[in-house]
Amino acid sequence: MKNHCLSLTVILAAAAMLIQTASAQSGLPSLPAATKADMEVVYTTAIENRTTDILKLLDLTDPAKSNVVHDIIMAQYRALRTRDEAIDARLKADGKEITFTNRADLLLAQSKPLHEQFLAKLAVILTPEQIEKVKTQMTYNKVAVTYDAYCAIVPGLTDADKAKILELLKQAREEAIDGGNAPEKSAIFQKYKDQINSYLDAHGHDTTKAFKDWEAKNATAGTAPAR
């Protein structure tokens, strides 16, 4: 299945179109078309909420410092949107479908300076532990959730196995904080989970069997990470 990695702006625009269509089909008066300014308000509200959630985890007591961190994170979200729009425009000009696979190389190349500048700005104000919390929240705590899942699903993991799993998941997180949306972040983590599975299979484990056994025991739970 292909991962369609649309920007948040495009997703919101599509939602607006669906509302318009539903209104027309119901026979009710059509809602006015969402303007670019309307979409910008919705987008700003979305990233403001995300940023607020991150700030809550940091326990910053200095309002001035909190405001600076707020502005850094907001600016990063906007920079990622601008990057995504440029990548999508380039793919469209080249006649390519906007998928994670097609975006991957461009994403890595164009994300590097944004990534480095973002973390450098945070490092001036925040401790390493606080920066870890920012990364964790920007990637929906996927490192801890996925690590715990592997420990629960794959029997007989050694300390070395667990260390390797954590190492690869943190690499995934480092790349995923630059993801433009949740599906893109998930696709990045999936790439690293594939590496984890290959590593474990090469070190005496059978991840395919482990996942099947887990799924059989938890048919309706849906707690196992994607293979």
Predicted regions and their residues:
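Bacterial N-terminal signal peptides that target proteins for export
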Residues: 1-9
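Bacterial N-terminal signal peptides
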Residues: 9-18
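Sec/Tat signal peptide C-region and signal peptidase I cleavage site
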Residues: 20-24
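Charge-rich (acidic/polar
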Residues: 25-227
